[in-house]
């Protein structure tokens, strides 16, 4: 959509998730020598710039303070403001009881993600796989909301449930949200817990375009996004940006930027890359061809991984589904949700809420299980403009939107691109291929077989952050 009286702004997010070993060396475009994960703490994983020892900037040196004082800030438990609606059954504020500030924000981020997922699902066909990275989308919306005013700001805060967060406690205000996103970035992306989780936020501004200095300062303070000059009509800019994203995502996302409208004046970029190691690995020699039921009539052969170990699992009688938790090293896990009936996916998708996930997690039991899970790789590319419009965010995407906190000139967003890739396979470490796993007789253990369409949710547990979610309808398709 063109806005002749407006300049254009684009929001672009890129997400990658894999399950390969952590021994692979990391490289940086500004460095000729590769470095090992043992030195991971020396890299600023927000800006992707190498920081030589003894030359850390002030913001990075503040990390030690963040590990103490700031943890108290984000993990403090505040009283919930009483409201008439809170007493209603199933109200999400009931989940806030006993939860920290960062967990409360992430509960509402998940609520937004589930609503957005449902809109994407309605726009897709029943045979489509789906995959999104909620933390990236919420972060991008948080960044842009810094510059929104009036009704435009209210729309975003309502749909993202930021307003619900602020209203939950007399101690919360709008700035609290941005402070928590800042602390979440430190918690998730600047600490090495045994997995690789990296993020880059970028703010690209066309040369000579007037951006408010307080907006640029707030972007840096809360989201670590440094303003950089760009020449969007120049193909060299696209090439350079694509190379940067290619390296960040270890080659998983190629040609991320294809065409940028020459009228674009500002681009906000959010990239996330995750690589985790299974706690219970899938030996490669156990992978075999197995039937996967697409629907009542169609079956495809897929590469089915197999392992045995202690796993948390639950069954939901109300939604008629089974849930399995697959743990990554370091406090991240993937929930696999499988409807017992092929026709049960619609009900499951319609009723998925943070309250339901909480119920699953509280009802899980730990025992020895044999697990069969298909390998899969999903590559998805969405323009979320129409999706967000249908959810109630309209002024952000038309010429009447109030973004006066960004620039004195009128701006309209014409693109909100969300591109994501996930690879799930046997590899957890280099030794995974030669790991020997003994299997007990089936009569003495429980088998969890994922041989029909399923949902998956990837959570970081300490912050209750929903990193990724999706649906695998056909593992043989991307």
UniProtKB/Swiss-Prot annotation:
PROSITE patterns given in the database record: SERPIN (PS00284)
Transmembrane segment boundaries: none
GO BP terms: blood coagulation
Sequence repeat coordinates: 54-64, 68-78
Signal peptide: 1-23
Alphabetical UniProt keywords: Blood coagulation, Glycoprotein, Hemostasis, Heparin-binding, Protease inhibitor, Repeat, Serine protease inhibitor, Signal, Sulfation
Sequence positions bearing Sulfotyrosine: 60, 73
Presence of keyword Repeat: yes
Glycosylation (residues): 30, 167, 366, 402
Expression across tissues: Expressed predominantly in liver.
UniProt xrefs under SMART domains: SERPIN
Protein's job: Thrombin inhibitor activated by the glycosaminoglycans, heparin or dermatan sulfate. In the presence of the latter, HC-II becomes the predominant thrombin inhibitor in place of antithrombin III (AT). Also inhibits chymotrypsin, but in a glycosaminoglycan-independent manner.
Family classification: Belongs to the serpin family.
Listed name of the protein: Heparin cofactor 2
Organism: Mus musculus
Biological classification of the source: Eukaryota, Metazoa, Chordata, Craniata, Vertebrata
């Amino acid at each position: 959509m063109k806005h002749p009286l407006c300049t254009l702004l684009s929001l672009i997010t890129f997400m990658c998730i894999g399950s390969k070993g952590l021994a692979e060396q990391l490289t940086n475009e500004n460095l000729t020598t590769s470095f090992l994960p043992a030195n991971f703490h020396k890299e600023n994983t927000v800006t992707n710039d190498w920081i030589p020892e003894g030359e850390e900037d002030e913001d990075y040196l503040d990390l030690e303070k963040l590990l103490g004082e700031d943890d108290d800030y984000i993990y403090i438990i505040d009283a919930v403001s009483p409201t008439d609606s809170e007493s209603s059954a199933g109200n999400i504020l009931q989940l806030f009881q006993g939860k920290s500030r960062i967990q409360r924000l992430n509960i509402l981020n998940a609520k937004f993600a589930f609503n957005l997922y449902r809109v994407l699902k309605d726009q897709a066909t029943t045979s489509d796989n789906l995959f999104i990275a909620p933390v990236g989308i919420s972060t991008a919306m948080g960044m842009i909301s810094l510059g929104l005013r009036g009704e435009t700001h209210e729309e975003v805060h309502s749909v993202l449930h930021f307003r619900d967060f602020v209203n939950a406690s007399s101690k919360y205000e709008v700035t609290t949200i941005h402070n928590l996103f800042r602390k979440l970035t430190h918690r998730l992306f600047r600490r090495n817990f045994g997995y690789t989780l990296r993020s880059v936020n970028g703010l690209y501004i066309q040369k000579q375009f007037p951006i408010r200095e307080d907006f640029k300062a707030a972007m840096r303070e809360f989201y670590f996004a440094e303003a950089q000059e760009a020449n969007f009509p120049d193909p060299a800019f696209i090439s350079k940006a694509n190379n940067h994203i290619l390296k960040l995502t270890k080659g998983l996302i190629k040609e991320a930027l294809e065409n940028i409208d020459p009228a674009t004046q500002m681009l906000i970029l959010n990239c996330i890359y995750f690589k985790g190691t299974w706690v219970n690995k899938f030996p490669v020699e156990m992978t075999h061809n197995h039937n996967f039921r697409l629907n009542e009539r169609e079956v495809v052969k897929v590469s089915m991984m197999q392992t045995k170990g202690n796993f948390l699992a639950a069954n939901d009688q109300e939604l008629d589904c089974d849930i399995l938790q697959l743990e990554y090293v370091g406090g991240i896990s993937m929930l696999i949700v499988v409807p017992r009936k092929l026709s049960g996916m619609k009900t499951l998708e319609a009723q998925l809420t943070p309250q339901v996930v909480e119920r699953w997690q509280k009802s899980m039991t730990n025992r020895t299980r044999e697990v069969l899970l298909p390998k899969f790789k999903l590559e998805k590319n969405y323009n979320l403009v129409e999706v967000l419009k249908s959810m109630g965010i309209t002024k952000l995407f038309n010429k009447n939107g109030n973004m006066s906190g960004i620039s004195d000139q009128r701006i309209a967003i014409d693109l909100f691109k969300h591109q994501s890739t996930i690879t799930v396979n046997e590899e957890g470490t280099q030794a995974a291929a030669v790991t020997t796993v003994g299997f007990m007789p089936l009569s003495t253990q429980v088998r969890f077989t994922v041989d029909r369409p399923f949902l998956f949710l990837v959570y970081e547990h300490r912050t209750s952050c929903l990193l990724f979610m999706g649906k695998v309808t056909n593992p043989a398709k991307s």
